[in-house]
Amino acid sequence: MSIVNSSTIGVNLGNSDGATALFGLGNTVNGSDGSQWLYVYATAAMVTGTVACYSTAYVAQPATASNLFGAAGGSPNSGMGLAFAQGTFAAADYGWICIRGADQYVRVSSVSTVGAALYLDTASSGVLTTTAASGTMAGIILLTASSTGVQTAVRAYLQYPRLSPGALFGV
């Protein structure tokens, strides 16, 4: 687990702050292992490794194809960013989500291999898969493999996760 190394007092990385905002939405802090964290409001529950999409108002929810591409698919919703929960959030909680760092958790839906291409799982919100699906991801490299067919959190390297340009333009 990363620890904060910015000068912001009271930061609790990887855990929800509960229903009370302790920092301004959109604040960022740096942590150990080259990590960077963003303070958000979660509109839905998230567990460790959940891929979250957040708006320009720093409101986060588990990522789905419809909240990234709109209900009809096609054009990406403007201003949506991607990050990963490193702890448990209840709906209506505030807390820090990870946008960069080594050795962070990501949630995958099935068997995965180190360095494999990752996609947004269309069957489960906030989950990645190595099976070709909607939204090819970039800026995420798995560091550990999963040998189970159920959702699990595995370690990854994150560098400002995003949809690849091909996913944005239907390529």
PLM features: residue spans?
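Glycine-anchored, exposed beta-strand/edge motif detector
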Residues: 1-171
